[in-house]
């Protein structure tokens, strides 16, 4: 059987885009501008469970992936954070013009307690320790709740056209701001820079801080036969 050059190239491209699954605690794969992590950082809190993450495809700057898990025990404790992390050069917030992103996702399974969130970190220097964590929860499923010093929101802002409850609390030496959508948002398109602009104008966040990490994924607390599907995710820092 003869193959044309175009067919051969198509097969090569298909091979390069073949799905890649990994189930180890710190498993990851690099695709385009993203590192996709399994990141079972809290698995020791579970009495039983497992999780596997799969890279499906990359088209331009849009990544498609999923993670499947079952976790029990360790009530109220996060077991993992499977996520797509953007590779970029850290920039001062004052120099960040936009963080454009799109995200379409879905969840299935039994008794799911989990969040679906952007997780972004700020530091006083490009390579320094994280000083602030900014989370944007598009979904708080099954009663999942954010870090909070009081258990109550400190504000109820509307950002990127979505109404949020804003919480504040410590995570070690970091201060964590969590924007939790009042209604689950399974399809998002907007500029994540707007969240920092809000914090600068209303919570005194310094624009001299460096944006050092932009991640997006899911934090499971408990549930079984869970399938978290990301059918469209992209983000870029400009």
Swiss-Prot record:
Pfam families: Glyco_hydro_12. One of its GO terms (biological process) is cell wall organization. GO terms for molecular function: cellulase activity; xyloglucan-specific endo-beta-1,4-glucanase activity. Its EC number is 3.2.1.151. Transmembrane segments: none annotated. GO terms for cellular component: extracellular region. Its main location: secreted. Keywords: Carbohydrate metabolism, Cell wall biogenesis/degradation, Glycoprotein, Glycosidase, Hydrolase, Polysaccharide degradation, Secreted, Signal. It is an enzyme of class 3 (hydrolase). Glycans are attached at residues 106, 171. It catalyses: xyloglucan + H2O = xyloglucan oligosaccharides. It comes from the Eukaryota. It is found in: Secreted. Residues 1-18 form the signal peptide. Catalyzes endohydrolysis of 1,4-beta-D-glucosidic linkages in xyloglucan with retention of the beta-configuration of the glycosyl residues. Specific for xyloglucan and does not hydrolyze other cell wall components. Belongs to the glycosyl hydrolase 12 (cellulase H) family. This is Probable xyloglucan-specific endo-beta-1,4-glucanase A. It comes from Neosartorya fischeri (strain ATCC 1020 / DSM 3700 / CBS 544.65 / FGSC A1164 / JCM 1740 / NRRL 181 / WB 181) (Aspergillus fischerianus).
């Amino acid at each position: 059987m003869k193959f044309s050059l175009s067919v051969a190239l198509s097969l090569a491209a298909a091979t390069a885009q073949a799905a890649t699954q990994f189930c180890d605690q710190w498993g990851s794969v690099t695709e385009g501008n993203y590192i996709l992590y399994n990141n079972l950082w809290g698995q020791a809190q579970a009495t039983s469970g497992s999780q596997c993450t799969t890279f499906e495809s990359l088209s331009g700057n849009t990544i498609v992936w999923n993670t499947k898990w079952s976790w029990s025990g360790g009530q109220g404790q996060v077991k993992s954070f499977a996520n797509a992390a953007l590779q970029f050069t850290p920039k001062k917030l004052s120099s960040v013009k936009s963080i454009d992103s799109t995200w379409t996702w879905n969840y299935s399974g039994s008794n799911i307690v989990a969040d679906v969130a952007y997780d972004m970190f700020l530091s006083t220097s490009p390579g320094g320790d994280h000083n602030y964590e900014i989370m944007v929860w598009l979904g708080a499923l099954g009663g999942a709740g954010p870090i909070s010093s009081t258990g109550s929101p400190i504000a109820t802002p509307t950002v990127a056209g979505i109404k949020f409850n804003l919480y504040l609390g410590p995570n070690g030496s970091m201060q964590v701001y969590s924007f939790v959508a009042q209604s689950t948002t399974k399809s998002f398109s907007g500029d994540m820079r707007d969240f920092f602009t809000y914090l600068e104008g209303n919570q005194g966040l310094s624009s001299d801080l460096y944006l050092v990490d932009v991640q997006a994924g899911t934090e499971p607390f408990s549930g079984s036969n869970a399938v978290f599907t990301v059918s469209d995710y992209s983000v870029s820092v400009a």
